[in-house]
Amino acid sequence: VIFIGLVVLSACSGWALLEREWTRPLSELFSPSLQLDIASMATQLHLVATSVVALLAGGLLGVVSILLQQLVKNPLASDTTLGVGIGAQLAMLIVTLFLPSLAIYGGLYVAFVGAIMSMGLVFALSAPSRFNPLILILAGLVVNILLAAVANVLVLFFAERSNGMLSWAAGFLAQSSWDSSRALMITATLAAIACLPLLKPLTLMSLDDSQAKRLGVPINGIRALVVVIVAVVTALVISEVGLIGFIGLGAASLVNALGISSIGKRLVTAFGLGALLLLLTSNVALLLEPILGMQIPAGAMTGILGAPLIIWLILRQRRDRIETITPMMSGQNKTVVFWRWSVGVIITIMLACLFVQDINGWGISTDWALTQQYRLPRSLSAAATGMMLAVAGVLLQTLTRNPMASPEVLGVSSGAALGVILGFLLLPILGLSAGAGTLLISGLSGAMAVLLLIMWLARRVSSGYLLLVGIGIAAMMDGVMHMVKLSGDPRLEAMLSWLSGTTYSAQPSTVWYLMGIALILLVLSLLIVKPLRVLGLGTGVARNLGVAVTPVTLSLLALVAALSTASTLAVGPLSFIGLMVPHLATSLGAVKLERQLLLAALLGAGVMVIADWIGRYVMFPYELPAGTVAAIIGGGYFLWLIRKVPTAANS
């Protein structure tokens, strides 16, 4: 039914596209190009070559995801979730900016190096845990966000030189020749030949490594060969058409939903489903272009359409369970001297305001007017944002009983950002002003919608699958942002800067309101600690103990939405504070929930102030956004922290 449905939808969308674009007899569509006039030849290449590229690229991405899932025995594995694509894209961006002479050898080699390095990093981080499913996906998430933050820094500093690269990397499938089709066809043929002798070893390895070894399977060699195949195929697809997310994961998830067990049939089916998914996406994007008045990259459409697909697939796999992990950093209950931490945060803010760099070098600033007007608002804005993100992370991890939950990972911050973006674009059309109040309501609506979806899914699926919700929402936001960037609307320049996580726009007149909101939300979080602690034991236990589960849960969701939206409005959605700081607070002895909330708030404020200060001066006179710096710091911290997970996971 799924396959037939995709065939019908692809055929209908393709026919609608032909009716609009092709005015000659249908029989001439596949005639030799040289027999057509110039306009018809261009249209033929645009329609047929683009469709062929979509079919081949989508099919190859589906095969890649099946190989990865078979290799690590994880239904969440794909080129998207394991950071393969972003590694290839970052490598090509670096070469474009700094080593353009290497481009004469073609993009395949550059993308291959990036793909193999990012995938190797993910595997190296998760290997000590024996590829624990959640550790593997978390490592992929961390690498994705970290590499995206690095790419964001490069784009900010080399905006003009990277503009063409970003437009291409958004995933444009439109073709004007058969070159990409031939390259992808050769790749598909070679990949099929390479996979044939691997079918039996992969089947044996899907049972148990020890049994496979006893049967004579060279496990390490097979794994290395599969990794090389995955990296080569992904690199070639990205070098030809840019980054296409979700197609591989969607195709592999559909194969899993169909219950196909034979590895050969899984690969063939994944190729067909991936091909149809990307063809359908490409057709929809082409059909929408005249309506929206702009080119729509297929890569952006896969993110926008992929999120609903993934949510549906999660519900289809609700009976599947993947193992969970214990908190990433355990701690003993210790006495936490909060006044010392509070003084430490105050000193950090003072140093960030007074210890500065200018044209004369480093020194202590004595210009109070300058500090009060510019530096203090930025430091206070960063502190308030870090505080809110950290508190939201503690609340989410307790509420969902998931140590990996945070506004960033579960897509709450992305939902708030999407709400703000849509409000900014749509409110003027509706005759409403896109002011701070209306944008706050838009952001709250987006964050609340994501939270309600997460809580609804949390009762139906394993907590590990909730990670896919965050990946889906983040991909949807990325897709919208790609379209925003390509729209050329000058009003959106400030929004693009805001989305990178900058405190540049902090004002003395508004920062105290932001700090007040952060403190009020922290107090509200402390007031709801008791029912939250009981909810953390499970809804059944909470009801037996007299907790009104639904009202309390909705209150908590509203609180998390307010925390996420206020912080997102302040510095954008990009950071790692909500995921990193709760674990850090626990490791420092704040085991009890109320202590964890207080210490996490102080740590979040301090870390964000430091990130903002580093961003201001590390490349002086240029600046790095605080959110981007926090993402890099947090990503590096988690890369180190994940190495400690096996001890917790196996204990």
Language-model features, listed with the residues they occupy:
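Alpha-helical transmembrane segments in inner-membrane proteins
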Residues: 1-651
